[in-house]
UniProtKB/Swiss-Prot annotation:
Protein localization: Cell inner membrane
Gene: tatB
Chief location bin: membrane
Name recorded for this polypeptide: Sec-independent protein translocase protein TatB
UniProt keyword annotations, A-Z: Cell inner membrane, Cell membrane, Membrane, Protein transport, Translocation, Transmembrane, Transmembrane helix, Transport
Length: 175
């Protein structure tokens, strides 16, 4: 606090001893100590109040910045593109629900996957129809007699005998 050295402190002590006297010097020093304690206590209280005011100011600034961030976050969620799109989709869905009540259910546009029964029905239908024209392009001389006689459909050849014949040919070539 005060820039007082040892030599200056000794001079103050000697002057106090001469001015006050040795008899009253301990009481005076005690009173000066009490004043110093009171001064330190007041300085501590002032410093504490000052620091508390600084903390409150910092807290006010912190609260203000927190409120700014909170309002920005609220504004961000209100102006969020996804939120607005979600609101539009929800509105469209409610309109679709109102329209779906009045209209009958739509027929699916994708065909059902074929089953073994549909293949059997198609083969039976093909067997019942007669072929009036030859399936292969033949020269005109051969095509005329075939047209004169009604064609009898031959049963469809299966792939299993062809596979057996191919296996038999391999066995014959190997021997």
């Amino acid at each position: 606090m005060f820039d007082i050295g040892w030599s200056e402190l000794m001079v103050i002590g000697v002057v106090a001893l001469i001015a006050i006297g040795p008899k009253e010097l301990p009481g005076v020093l005690r009173m000066v100590g009490q004043w110093m304690g009171k001064a330190r206590k007041l300085a501590g209280e002032f410093q504490g109040q000052f620091q508390e005011a600084m903390r409150e100011a910092e807290m006010a600034d912190l609260k203000k910045s927190f409120d700014e961030v909170k309002s920005a976050a609220t504004g961000f969620t209100e102006n969020n593109v996804l939120t607005s799109l979600q609101k539009d989709v929800d509105a469209a869905m409610t309109i679709d629900k109102v329209q779906n009540i009045d209209t009958p259910p739509a027929v699916p546009t994708t065909p059902e996957p074929p089953t073994a029964e549909t293949f059997a029905e198609a083969e039976a239908h093909a067997m019942q129809t007669t072929v009036t024209e030859p399936l292969a392009i033949l020269p005109p001389a051969v095509a005329e007699p075939a047209a004169a006689e009604p064609a009898v459909p031959e049963p469809a050849a299966t792939t299993a005998p062809v596979a057996v014949d191919a296996a038999a040919d391999k066995d014959a070539k190997a021997s």
